[in-house]
Amino acid sequence: MSGSGDREILLIAHPGRAEIVETAHRAAKIFTEAGIGLRVLADEAPSTRFDSRAEPAPVTGPAGDAVRVVEHSAAAAVGCEMVLALGGDGTFLRAAELARPASVPVLGINLGRIGFLTEAEAEHLDEALGQVVRGDYRVEDRMTIDVTVRVEDEVVESGWALNEASIENASRMGVLEVVLEVDGRPVSAFGCDGILIATPTGSTAYAFSAGGPVVWPELEALLVIPSNAHALFARPLVTSPESRIAVESVATGHDAIVFLDGRRTLALPRGGRVEAVRGSEPVRWVRLDSAPFADRMVRKFQLPVTGWRGRRRTESTRADRDQD
């Protein structure tokens, strides 16, 4: 829930969505009428028509100027109550890049397809933003992973991810030969197309497609999922959130690339080493409802549940039998 004082929200929007202008301006109207300021990034202002050269003109409200254009930098979300992401999971991940260093939460409104990271669908925009205006929401922290690339024991690159770090063959040709290490001990060596290190949040993303388990977000853990491995033992692993995962690329093999959430990359030369640990900072999440994760998974993935009777019906049947 928000604190007292001036309230301001940073808007991040998917520029390729036809409905984004209408949705963004609807959000601006709701917030400004409630006295809440809105920030937009300078490089997004033209596509959302929040610059002085575009129509419709920015709306105004009790807060004065409806929209404040800010530069796209690590400080863009500093001082905001939250970051509002209008789009799909990719937009949410982009918003998280700005929200995390500012330690502010992200609220995702789905304008995409699945939108597993988002909290509400576009048709429920007014209701969702109404809850924000009233401060009727809670914030939960989701663990991240910090990733480091070492070459000859020297740190050469580092980054972080909310969903996963995906280590892949840079040339896309041949097999990537790796050695997996957990907590300082070797576990297995194998050839593969790649290997993922994921969080519970990322278990419903790329890791899900690669055959990894779905992990409830309340459970903190690190997941290791080999992709198309050529080995008898190369199964998905679930480790402690405090584990230190390392993947070494053999010196005679291929150069590799580490994709962080599919958005940022680190170079892994042959003979290099990737280390992943629990992130130093979480990504903070705006939650508007308390629906069970199972319900969310069924809804987002459109899972069939026909035939489910549930405990209530079972208990009533037992009660009828007891009376007989």
Swiss-Prot record:
Residues involved in NAD(+) binding: D89, G90, R94, N163, E164, D193, T204, A205, Y206, A207, F208, S209
Cofactor(s) this protein cannot do without: a divalent metal cation
Cellular localisation: Cytoplasm
Any one GO MF annotation of this record: metal ion binding
Keywords: ATP-binding, Cytoplasm, Kinase, NAD, NADP, Nucleotide-binding, Transferase
EC number of the protein: 2.7.1.23
NCBIfam families: PRK03372.1
Its biological purpose: Involved in the regulation of the intracellular balance of NAD and NADP, and is a key enzyme in the biosynthesis of NADP. Catalyzes specifically the phosphorylation on 2'-hydroxyl of the adenosine moiety of NAD to yield NADP.
Protein name as it appears in the record: NAD kinase
GN (gene name): nadK
